[in-house]
Amino acid sequence: MMEAFPWLEFCLPPCPEPAQERSYEYIESISSPRILTFHGWPHLTPQGLPNTKYILLLRNPKDVAVSMYHHLRGKKSISYQNNWNDFFELYLSGQVHYGSWFDFHLHWEKFLSSRQQVLYLTYEELKKNIKTCLSQLAAFLEIKVSAEVIDKVAIGSKLEEMKKNDKADCNWMRTNQNEAPHLRKGIVGDWRNYFTEEQNQRFNDLYIKKMSGSKFKDYWDESILGITRED
């Protein structure tokens, strides 16, 4: 996966194995147009490139919490050992990788507001209408593709298919076979199996407070996020 779409953050120290060759010089050597993946804050992205196109993929922050919890438990360089309740407190207070989900997305929203070429996608929409999203993506990138190619990519993007691909599954990140793999469930709404009623209410209160002025606030309906929209 990283060979096709290098992770830009691996240019930043410390550079984890087996990505030592993913240096800044390596990224610079890739001819344009190039596709780079990035999980970090916007101020760390390459600047002064006016033709850059940005694709921001968002996911329900409650599912993000559960996914991050399992990801950190299985990652070699971290191997988080505490339970879900402890992790929830860290997540809610922003004491996790990349900091507060709220601040992270508010910074990206502000950063992208001054950019002309931006495509917003949600994980939930990808799960629901993958072919439509792929068509939008191809149009945004100005890539002409046939319906057959869209069908093939849609099939290859299914979690069951990606798990068969060692490069996509990123097994090198795992600590041991007892932990969750890099590609775990990939479902929408798994947070309901983890959040207690009290945790859910606390998160909802903070979400409404922090995201009140954001256009991302209503990206997910009540059935997904579990927060009633205000008309």
Label for each model-derived stretch:
Residues D151-K164, N171-W172:
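Active-site/pore-lining binding-face segments in mid-to-C-terminal subdomains
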Residues M1-L121, E148, K167-D231:
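PAPS-dependent sulfotransferase catalytic domain
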